[in-house]
Amino acid sequence: MKNIMKLFLYAALPLALIALGSCSYPKNITFKADSQTGALSGLYLTSDTSMNWILRTDGTQYEWVDSRYRWGLGHLRINGTEYSWNIPTKKHDTSHHMTVKYQTGDIEINVARKWNRDGNLVESYEFVNTGEKDADLQDIAINTPFNDNYPDARTCYEARCNAHIWAGGNEAYVYCTRMSGAPGGLGLIMEEGAIKGYEVRERPQKNGSSNFRGVFQLNPQDKTLKPGECYTIQWLLLSADNWDEFQAKAIDNGLIIASADRYVVEAGEKINVSFKSNCPSLKGKLLLNGKEVAEVSGDNITYTTTINEPGEKIFTLAYGNGKQTSVECLAVSNFDSLVNHRCQFIAGHQQFIKPGDPRSGAFIVYDKRYRIPLHQRRKWQQTL
């Protein structure tokens, strides 16, 4: 009997290992990848696959948005010379994960995509210096072409989003809401590395101007790599029904949410900033425009101060091993005087007055660089 049981166990073991190897977590986010570039051409919520949250990059949605702008491709400067990555040297994908390798100059870029236990998509970009000298990486830009544009009312209502980007350093995030206001949005939160800003490409007037918000690219912090050294940017893509749920999920996944009760105040008024996390043991220093103002700790850090002088006010939480995130606010001398000054400028520079002209009384665009109305600047340029 014991021998029979052993035989049964030995026979069952390979089947169990196969089952473990093939098991997969539920997927809240799914994607389509381009077979040639390894970049993403589609990004979807599993709960509603009818909406693609990123631009079609084959020229069919906008003729100027082509394969250069596919999700996950990008460009950077290496020791002052600009490079881009778009053709993989190696690619491997299964139903559980995907890896793509690129080489540009002396920098190897390894892109990995996989699902975590919660069914959220983890995406990482590893930059490796394969050269024999230090590599100064600057102006890094990773394509994240969120589908934020305005073709027509029905399309906007059913299949477009508003992308809200918080370039908050190590605690950066993006939350895309449906233009219809319906529940269900796409979130992106940083897990490793930092995002210092973002770019918007392909948005000149001839490309739709205000109806096309452009192609978004996230900008990681600059980095100098010694030979063999690597630098990783990693973020998590998840779904959330609304802003409250997104922030709750972001905090639960380790993000620090920075905010202020007001982002524009008059000089002499108080402002409250907060940094919420799921880490009660968090300790750090709070800086105001680079100057330390307080030592802080806890999972709900708050700071209140009176702003006495107008200008930009940057509240920075510095913590951990060189990590930081910031809240930027603006103080003005007086709202009434600001509005009055603006109204005087509009009346004096932007109202077209010419009796008999059908445009008389209309408000026009004023070019502050040349200090003349836009239509006059165009006439002047045509005479050059």
Language model regions located:
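Catalytic cores of secreted or luminal carbohydrate-active enzymes
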Residues: V215-G254
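Beta-strand-rich N-terminal accessory domains
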Residues: C23-S124, V128-I195, R203-K206, V215, ...
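Extended acidic/polar, glycine-enriched regions
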Residues: C279-V339
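Extracellular ectodomain segments of secreted/surface proteins
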Residues: D241-P280
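Beta-strand-rich interaction surfaces with strong enrichment in secreted/lumenal proteins
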Residues: V111-K114, P220-T224, V293-A294, Y303-T305
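Bacterial N-terminal signal peptides
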Residues: Y10-A19
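Solvent-exposed, conformationally flexible loop/turn segments
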Residues: P227-G228, V265-K270, G298
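An acidic-aromatic substrate-binding cleft motif
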Residues: I256, A260-N272, Q324-L384
